[in-house]
Amino acid sequence: MTHIAKSVGKGGANRPVDVVKIQNLINNNDSYTKLTTPLAVTGVADTALNDAITAFQDNHPDLKTSDGRVDPRGKTLKALNQYNNAAKQCRSYYPLWFSKLRLEKNFDVTRFLKLYARQFPRHPLTGTRQSGLKTLLEALVADANLDNIRWAAYMLATVKHECANTWQPIEEYGKGAGRPYGKAVKVTDPASKQVYTNTYYGRGYVQLTWEDNYKKMDTALSLQGADSLHLHPEKALEAKTAYRIMSHGMRNGSFTGKKLSSYIVGTSADYFNARRIINGTDQALLIKGYAEELEFLLRFCNGK
């Protein structure tokens, strides 16, 4: 049974994840749509899709109206799910790479950005938002340590939430004011003997806090000298370093002791409880929803 979150077709919200699902269903109902060739499954609603939905509604015996739209709990979706195609069985018209477990090197970043903008229109993907998401996607594709495309989906969902849709590493709001880790401390560079006054409040794609954690991440990532997070905590705001912190931390349980493999293994993904990797179950349901939609888009764009 195929479900959609929002309406598709004439006057619909036409979110790409939903559009792909309906395009696939339409192609499995050629006995009612009268299509001679399948629709291109693109994730973008167009006149061809609207006409096919209308034709399906006109020709299906259980449907009385033809408004050219499929609603999440409507009769048209129920009828589409009956799969009355010529072969009498459901076929997949998704891209061949849709089922791949890992992100591929030929991942279509440009296509993802276009579909993402349609999927999440409340936060327009312009300027630094677009460049930031592009940078993050390229880092995910290049990361040899990511064994599962679902890991990438949950990392993206986490950044979307933690960085408030900016897709840029950010500083903690309030810079630790009133918190124990928000007090300035003096640290000395062992090589140059230069003394720095630093405050170890949250920074990055995910918030790295406390002096000891900055030290530990230096060790984990082999950072020293000018690259040392302990000496130069502002380095956690650089995209490359912020990504390394997030990837290592989420894979190895550096933040809360919980890690990606605790919740996402093979084809199984507990996106709700995966929030425990970062912050208990705070906003877990919201981030779960992001992860599910982002996983679908990642899969759809995982090739050219």
Which residues fall in each region the model found?
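Conserved aromatic-histidine-acidic binding/catalytic patches
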Residues: V41, P124, D143-D147, Y196, ...
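Hydrophobic/aromatic-lined pockets within catalytic cores
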Residues: N27, P61, V141, N145, ...
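An amphipathic alpha-helical core segment
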Residues: L229-T281
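Surface-exposed patches in mature extracellular/periplasmic domains of secreted proteins
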Residues: K34-V41, T65-R69, D143-M155, Q168-E172, ...
